[in-house]
C-alpha cells in the first residue's frame, strides 16, 4: 500500500540515516504500518537515547514489541485506546501496550520540553517540519495524526499543515468551545492520504474525541481496502 515506488523499508532506512546525521529522534513502532502518529516531543533525547533509538528501530524484532504499561504515560495509554478503537480490537496483553504493531510514532520537536521552553525550541521545530516535508518515509503513510497541538498549524496567514503534507483542509470535528477538536485534511490529487490535526494526547483527551477520530480513520482505511 505504498504510495511511492520504493519499498517502505528502504524509505525507513533513509529516514533513520537522516535522523542519525541530524542527531534527531526517529521514533518507534511499526514503520510498515498504515498509521503515523506525530506527537510534540520525546521525554529523553540525550545523545545516548538517540543512538539507542536508532538501534532499536533497526531491530525488526524489537521495534514493535509490546511495552510494559507505565501508568504515568497518559500519551501512550491514549494511543493504545485510539488504535484499539480503529481496529475494533482488544490487546492480548493485560500488563503491556501493543499499539505499536499498528502505528509508527515520532515527535515534531527534537528538544525535550523539560530542557527548554517552546520559544527556544521553535527554530528546531520549524527545521523538523521541513525535514518531514522532504521525507518520503513520513509522506508515505495512509493516515498521519498530528497530535501536537500548536506546534504546527493552519490559519489565515500560515498553512503549515497543507504545505508540509501536500493536503487541503477538509472538515472540523467537535464544537468550537471544546478543547477536544480535530481537523481532517486530504490530498485531493491522491486521496489515499488522510492527515488529522489535534491536540497533544498527554492529558485532557475525551473518550468521545478518541471514538470519533477512530471512526473517521477506520472509514478511510476501509475505503482503501486496508482493513
Report residues per predicted region.
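Short, solvent-exposed loop/turn segments at secondary-structure junctions
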Residues: 41-45, 109-113, 149-154, 200-204
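Short, contiguous, well-structured surface segments enriched in hydrophobic/aromatic residues
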Residues: 95-113
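C-terminal capping/extension of enzyme domains
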Residues: 1-16, 120-133, 155-227
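Acidic, metal/cofactor-coordinating or nucleic-acid-engaging core segments within structured domains
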Residues: 65-96
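Proline-aspartate-enriched helix->loop->beta-strand connector
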Residues: 133-150
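Surface-exposed cleft-lining segments at the edges of enzyme active sites
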Residues: 61-75, 109-126, 200
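Active-site and ligand/interface coordination hotspots across diverse enzymes
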Residues: 1-75, 128-135, 181-189, 222-227
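Structural motif
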Residues: 37, 145, 195-197
Amino acid at each position: 500500500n505504498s504510495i511511492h515506488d520504493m519499498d517502505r523499508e528502504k524509505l525507513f532506512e533513509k529516514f533513520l540515516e537522516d535522523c542519525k546525521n541530524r542527531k534527531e529522534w526517529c521514533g518507534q513502532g511499526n514503520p510498515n504500518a498504515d498509521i503515523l502518529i506525530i506527537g510534540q516531543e520525546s521525554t529523553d533525547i540525550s545523545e545516548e537515547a538517540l543512538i539507542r533509538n536508532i538501534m532499536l528501530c533497526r531491530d525488526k524484532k524489537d521495534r514493535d514489541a509490546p511495552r510494559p504499561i507505565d501508568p504515568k504515560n497518559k500519551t501512550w495509554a491514549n494511543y493504545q485506546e485510539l488504535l484499539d478503537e480503529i481496529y475494533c480490537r482488544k490487546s492480548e496483553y493485560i500488563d503491556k501496550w501493543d499499539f505499536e504493531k499498528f502505528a509508527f510514532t515520532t515527535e515534531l520537536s527534537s528538544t525535550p520540553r523539560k530542557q527548554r521552553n517552546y520559544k527556544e525550541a521553535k527554530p528546531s521545530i520549524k527545521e523538523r517540519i521541513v525535514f518531514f516535508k522532504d521525507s518520503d518515509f513520513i509522506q508515505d503513510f495512509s493516515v498521519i495524526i498530528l497530535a501536537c497541538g500548536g506546534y504546527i498549524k493552519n490559519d489565515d496567514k500560515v498553512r503549515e499543515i497543507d504545505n508540509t503534507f501536500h493536503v487541503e483542509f477538509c472538515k472540523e470535528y467537535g464544537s468550537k468551545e471544546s478543547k477536544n477538536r480535530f481537523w481532517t485534511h486530504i490530498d485531493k490529487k491522491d486521496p489515499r492520504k488522510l492527515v488529522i490535526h489535534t491536540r497533544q494526547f498527554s492529558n485532557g483527551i475525551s473518550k468521545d474525541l478518541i471514538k470519533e477520530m477512530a471512526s473517521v480513520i477506520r472509514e478511510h482505511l476501509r475505503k482503501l481496502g486496508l482493513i
